[in-house]
Amino acid sequence: MIWFYAKQGHHLRCEIRHLTDGDQFDLVITDADGSERVEHFSDSASLTRRTLQLEAEWFHQGWDGPFGREY
């Protein structure tokens, strides 16, 4: 699952990758400058909490979104 956020012509990308080893996930965040960071989660509940936290932070910073895309 991939989400995009937009602000004044800049974009953030947030991707969730379900790993093949059990209930594990990577959250890949690509910032507007192209830098990328990865956060690892060992369960979906932790991933959901972090995703909601990021959405709230980005909303308060003026980012529009999320705009989703499934693949």
Description of each model-found segment:
Residues 1, 27-28, 66:
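A broad, low-specificity signal for short, low-complexity segments enriched in glycine/proline
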Residues 12-36, 53:
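Short aromatic-glycine-(Arg/Gly/Cys) micro-motifs in beta-strand/loop hairpins
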Residues 32-46:
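A short, exposed loop/beta-hairpin motif centered on an aromatic-Gly-Thr core
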Residues 1-14:
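N-terminal acidic leader/helix
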Residues 67-71:
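Intrinsically disordered, low-complexity charged/polar segments
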Residues 42-63:
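A short, charged, amphipathic alpha-helix used as a generic interaction element across diverse proteins
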